[in-house]
UniProtKB/Swiss-Prot annotation:
It comes from Capra hircus (Goat). A motif (Cell attachment site) lies at residues 397-399. The modification Phosphoserine is found at S746, S757. Both Ser-746 and Ser-757 become phosphorylated when T-cells are exposed to phorbol esters. Phosphorylation on Thr-759 (but not on Ser-757) allows interaction with 14-3-3 proteins. Pfam families: EGF_2, EGF_integrin, Integrin_b_cyt, Integrin_B_tail, Integrin_beta, PSI_integrin. This is Integrin beta-2.
Amino acid sequence: MLPQRPQLLLLAGLLALQSVLSQECTKYKVSTCRDCIESGPGCAWCQKLNFTGQGEPDSTRCDTRAQLLSKGCPADDIMEPKSLAETRQSQAGKQKQLSPEEVTLYLRPGQAAAFNVTFQRAKGYPIDLYYLMDLSYSMVDDLANVKKLGGDLLRALNDITESGRIGFGSFVDKTVLPFVNTHPEKLRNPCPNKEKQCQPPFAFRHVLKLTDNSKQFETEVGKQLISGNLDAPEGGLDAMMQVAACPEEIGWRNVTRLLVFATDDGFHFAGDGKLGAILTPNDGRCHLEDNLYKSSNEFDYPSVGQLAHKLAESNIQPIFAVTKKMVKTYEKLTEIIPKSAVGELSEDSKNVVELIKSAYNKLSSRVFLDHNTLPDTLKVAYDSFCSNGVSQVDQPRGDCDGVQINVPITFQVKVTATECIQEQSFTIRALGFTDTVTVRVLPQCECQCRDASRDRSVCGGRGSMECGVCRCDAGYIGKNCECQTHGRSSQELEGSCRKDNSSIICSGLGDCICGQCVCHTSDVPNKKIYGQFCECDNVNCERYDGQVCGGEKRGLCFCGTCRCNEQHEGSACQCLKSTQGCLNLDGVECSGRGRCRCNVCQCDPGYQPPLCIDCPGCPVPCAGFAPCTECLKFDKGPFAKNCSAACGQTKLLSSPVPGGRKCKERDSEGCWMTYTLVQRDGRNRYDVHVDDMLECVKGPNIAAIVGGTVGGVVLVGILLLVIWKALTHLSDLREYHRFEKEKLKSQWNNDNPLFKSATTTVMNPKFAES
């Protein structure tokens, strides 16, 4: 599968090139070549002298390469710095698994610089192995076997490497409730079997520094005694943190570092310390005193993420040797801790050597390429091209599995800066291995223009040419440094170029030259920008039929408003100046109840188009015309004395007119008038035709109504009394009959049932026998 790797690299490079070429140039407030380069990876700058025309801003020089070429900029005058990478290979004679040793990147904002990193797994690389064991009481059988493992462990390491060392440490838990029993007797001997000798509980004890002496390992481990605690989870993460944070005390070399973690139970993590009133977060520092973690009761347990970061920082690969019931738990843990493995430990730890060998082979055959923490302005992505044919693109870290000894694999690293950055460095390394790649990052934001030595006369002798643009001396401004400031600051000059104290100079469409706006020439054909603050143009008006102001034959655009010719009107000159469609049969425009706009009536409220007549479903103002109808026809009512003045706009018709609205209203004397309203042109103007006859209804008989009402009330009262009397009589009759029945059922004699006789007769039993 190896021949595919160059093809994949070529494909990735072509895709990256296509992505860059397809980018556009989005610019904002660009006046220098540096501003242009910072605007985006697709931007380029034309340094050609006099490239911009009259009224064109300097930002015209900034565009895509294709656009600049089309505008007449020679290819040699286009400044387009690229991101690039320079590598320095490892020194000869050094055994390096990772190359190159150093890379220098020149980064343009938004444009990635790519370089290749090669990893070649070496055979026999030195190994340090630290055995960290749980000494809670349930591990008593395991401790007995581990005491004999010194020679086997070193022999297993020597099968892999020529330089192997082993060390030993142990842990139990924090020595406060509820983790251990704090009774003095239990602290001396925490084991459930009092006859068995146990050591007091402790958090972590560093027993043996890393050594290649197997006898010393067996001797020191042989001195260890089992201990005990209360709860099931152990303080293993506390111990692992100290092993990672104390490299000098443990004796770690700058080689492959393995940490074997042997236990038969779970683990406490951050937050559990609150159960023992331990609130201070773990600080991730070394706190060993006399090889004991004596500050255990002062700091909480570390979090899993904190421990993972510390292990990766210390380049330590943990191997979790756990019993069967705990395998799934620690497999979840390995998903968070990179470069870690899990092995199933037998109940008495007899298989620990084979477990370590298997886990090491698994760890060393998988390579993770990662980097240290970077600022937000730098982004790193990895493309992995593995020897087994598997490829991954644009991942947050490199990842290859099944890596074989002496078979190189390639990672492509792509680094992108989001802005012009300061010079800085970071390192890339393969997790679990000691080799690193140092990456030095420098900004690529300046243009190497060739006009630095040109004659100052181009800028009127008051400035110098930089990348085709005049950089004026103090006291002068302008495109050719033609404007003298006379002591005024640039802010004061720009103030007169801001409309309504806006923050935008010349509406963003011009340059402020000597305190006056010089409007830009637009790229849009036939568009003209003008106005004191360049706030106007001749295209930003309403459109009709796809044209501004309906086209030049209808009107022209002036600063956002259409000015129509004599034959047209409307906001977009869309209407002819005609009222033909607004005239009624009498030739009155909109019946006098609206305005004619675009040959269509815009009616007043209460009327409807097309000619502003009464709404068919709307109410008729009959009541409002009743007083005028009464005075005009019958010469009476509230307007009888001034009828001609009050009802001058209402005409009395002698004969009915078809199409009128029928009304029926009461007059001042309560009689009904029937009349017809006929609408005339204008607002609230009606003619009226009134029927000759009034409908006057006789008044009601008040005496009859009052007498009937009083009589009805009296009769209803009498009827209610009769009904009440009848009901009470029936109730009394029913009670009397029941009493009679009870009387017949009773049996009485002449004796009082409550009387008790005062005489008592007692019989003598002896007398009866005789």
